[in-house]
Structure formats: C-alpha cells, structure tokens
Amino acid sequence: VSILTVAMSIHVAIRHTTHYTFDRRVSLSPHVVRLRPAPHSRTPILAYTLKITPETHFINWQQDPFGNYLARLVFPEATREFSVDVEVIADMTVINPFDYFIEESAFHWPFDYDAALKRELAPYLETEPAGERLAAWLAEVPRERVHSNDFLVALNQRLQRDIAYTVRMEPGIQACEETLQKALGSCRDTAWLLVQILRHLGLAARFVSGYLVQLTADEKSLDGPSGPEADFTDLHAWAEVYLPGAGWIGLDPTSGLFAGEGHIPLACTPQPSSAAPIDGMTDPCEV
C-alpha cells in the first residue's frame, strides 16, 4: 500500500497481484473475478484498474444478483500462466461508522422488519441449524429492550473476545460449531459465525469479502493500543447487518469494531461461496 497526502486528506494506492504459473500449457475455464470495490463502499474510490494475463482474453463486466461488480473472463487459448493485477486508489478520509439514522421502528432491539422488507431480505435471514455450542452462545444474549447500536456493539465485542484470530490457509469456512469449539478462527470463519448469530436473532446479515487498510498513527496512543507498526493491507472478511433507515452496517468481529474507512468491500453476499475473490478451473496440472 502506498500513501499520498493531498490537501489534508490521505489517498492510498493498493496493488494486489494473484499469479499462477503452471507446469504445462492448460486451458482455463471461464473465470469470475470479484476484486472491484462494491458500489456501496463508503470509502470513496478515486481510481481502479484490472490487468489480466494472458493478454488474449475476453472480459465482461457484470453485476451479480446482489449488486456486486464482477469481471467474467474467457480465455480462447491455452496458457502457462494466469495473473490478476488490481490497483485501487482510495480516499481515506475518516468515516464515523455511526453516521446514520435508524427508523423509529428499529431504534431498539428486539425489532421486526415489516412484511415487505422481510420478503426482500429473505436470503439474508436464512439460518443454518444451530448446534449445541451456537445455541448455548445465543442463549446468553440478553433479550432486554436496548438501543440497537448498543446491542450490536456489545454483540460484536463479545464475539471478538470469545474467538481468537488465526491465519488459516485451508480453503473454505469452518462450521460455526468448530469455530466455537476451538475458540479460534480466521477472519472469514468469525465473519460467517457473526452472520449466523445475527440471523438467529432475527436480523438480516450478509458476508463481506474486502480489503482492510490499516495505517500507522502519527502519534502513539498514551492509554490504549497504538495500532499497526507499519502501513498494512490484506484481504479480509467481516459482516454487515441491515438496519431500517441506516441500510447495511459493517461489523468486524476480528477487531470488535464497526467498519470504517479502512474497510473496502468487494463482494457482499448471503453465502461466503458467492464472495470468493477468484472462481474458475483449469486442466489438471501442477501449480
């Protein structure tokens, strides 16, 4: 990540390269790339470029059923390499994550969505059966009437305390029971667990894949965490919950914080499998 200060605002340049080299020439199936900031990103995106290797390819920009940008790639010739090179320039002006209004009907939790909205949110309300550990976790959630913001802050922070973070290279998402049993998970594991928790509590929620940009502070904190020692960017996952009047609000259970300017969503979907950064197949080969 490169940093550029422009007239008291901070612009960051993110470069993200995924590169595969094969041991033989292979045919590539059509690929889908979900590495363009989503239309609803609260962080202003100033520029975006996508470069694909091999150069002989066809690209068709689309939006999926959930409004996310995706690039569908078709490769007419066999190749020994495949790369996706993304560059994003974003304006990192500080965002107040609580800068929204909530409809009076949803001002306090618990609340119900009206019938028409509930139909529209149906894919984001589907739950997986709650196992023993998830049921026990949900049973400890207070049901007293409380401001919806306060409820979500407490829920997100509780999950952050309960699940330790780990880098997990295996593909896929852990089952909620496994994440709770281990008290350990990657960002995508904890994000999916939070999605299921919110849905079991009657709140529409979706899985988010995106970039997390963390910048060093100008001065070290005197009474709290000082943040990262160096500017840092990585692929990350978090959750979004739907609040009437406010729309989709990001919650990051890895940090226990609401999503801010450093959270740049790429794909927001009912299921994690629909948010994979790159989808596609090749002929049998070694990579």
Language model segments and positions:
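A short, charged
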Residues: A122-A130, P277-V287
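Glycine-rich, flexible loop/turn motifs
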Residues: F22, N96, F107, R161, ...
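Secondary-structure boundary elements
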Residues: F107-G185, L193, H200, P272
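A broad, low-specificity signal for short, low-complexity segments enriched in glycine/proline
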Residues: S9-A13, R42-K51, T166-R168, R199, ...
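Short N-terminal helix-initiation segments at or just after the protein's N-terminus
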Residues: T21-V33, P171-L180, H236
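Linear, non-domain "peripheral" regions
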Residues: I3-A139, R145
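Acidic, mature catalytic/reactive cores of soluble proteins
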Residues: S2-L4, V153-A154
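Hydrophobic/aromatic-rich core segments of domains that either
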Residues: Q157, D189-C285
